[in-house]
Swiss-Prot record:
GO biological process: cobalamin biosynthetic process
Pathway where this protein functions: Cofactor biosynthesis; adenosylcobalamin biosynthesis; adenosylcobalamin from cob(II)yrinate a,c-diamide: step 7/7
Any one GO CC term of the record: plasma membrane
Catalytic activity: alpha-ribazole + adenosylcob(III)inamide-GDP = adenosylcob(III)alamin + GMP + H(+); alpha-ribazole 5'-phosphate + adenosylcob(III)inamide-GDP = adenosylcob(III)alamin 5'-phosphate + GMP + H(+)
Protein name (database record): Adenosylcobinamide-GDP ribazoletransferase
NCBIfam families xrefs: cobS (TIGR00317), PRK00235.1-5 (NF001278)
Species this protein is from: Pseudomonas fluorescens (strain SBW25)
């Protein structure tokens, strides 16, 4: 179960203590549990939404979004901000884009991007609460985290060394493909027709965003993986809310 706890520690702000430094093989296997962490997040968000039924609609959505951000510790939003700055400021140049991603400062485009993504999530949550579509609260985090597994399965990691390289090098690929298939089936089981629509929408967005990464960088980084997760989450929420 250590790979699960590694995944939960990395993807969440929950106080998880690991018994020492994980081995590279354990880091690679932790990717297999990313969709499981997504389901856990979704169940927690669904439970909170259920508890908030009867609260004013806008407050309900705001509290739900706040919990969503706090659960992940803002980790993937940080990746989205860095990627947005780098994509605009990199002017199509690979090395300049990678260098900007490592800069801890956030420029105006990062702030605007974060604002737009959070606004879209908030308004989609308002619509989904009105529709009483609780399944979307499980589907979005599940698909978002499964997309990171899919990205590492299909895309070269371009920064040598570090956590991302260990994840990429030691990911059990055949089992990873099986986990992705099971994740898709879980989405259909959870959401029915809506679950299938969410998977199709996410797949289309994934293909487009991955191609952008490959064209610019020749692969992915931790920041672009986080950006992918955030953008697929918002795509699923907005798609199901429409």
């Amino acid at each position: 179960m250590l790979p699960f706890w590694i995944a939960l520690q990395f993807l969440s702000s929950l106080p998880i203590r690991l018994p020492g430094m994980p081995q590279p093989q354990e880091l690679g296997r932790s990717l297999l549990f990313y969709p499981v962490v997504g389901v856990l997040f979704g169940v927690l968000l669904w439970a909170l939404s259920t508890a908030l039924m009867g609260a004013p609609l806008l407050l309900h959505a705001a509290l739900l979004l706040t919990a969503w951000v706090l659960l992940s510790g803002g980790l993937h939003l940080d990746g989205l901000a860095d990627s947005a700055d780098a994509w605009l400021g990199g002017f199509g140049d690979r090395e300049r884009t990678l260098a900007i991603m490592k800069d801890p400062r956030s420029g105006p485009i990062a702030v605007v991007t974060l604002g737009l993504v959070l606004l879209l999530k908030f308004t989609a949550l308002v619509a989904l609460i009105e529709q009483q579509n609780g399944a979307a609260l499980i589907l979005a985090p599940l698909i978002g985290r499964a997309s990171m597994l899919a990205l590492f399965l299909t895309t070269r990691y371009v920064r040598a060394g570090g956590l991302g390289q260990a994840l990429s090098d030691h990911l059990p690929r055949i089992v990873g493909q099986q986990v992705l298939i099971l994740s898709g089936l879980a989405c259909i089981l959870i959401g029915g027709f809506s679950g299938g629509v969410a998977v199709l929408l996410a797949a289309i967005c994934f293909i487009g965003l991955r191609q952008l990464m490959v064209n610019r960088l020749g692969g992915t980084t931790g920041d672009t993986a986080g950006a992918l997760l955030e953008l697929l989450e918002v795509a699923v929420l907005v798609g199901l809310a429409l």
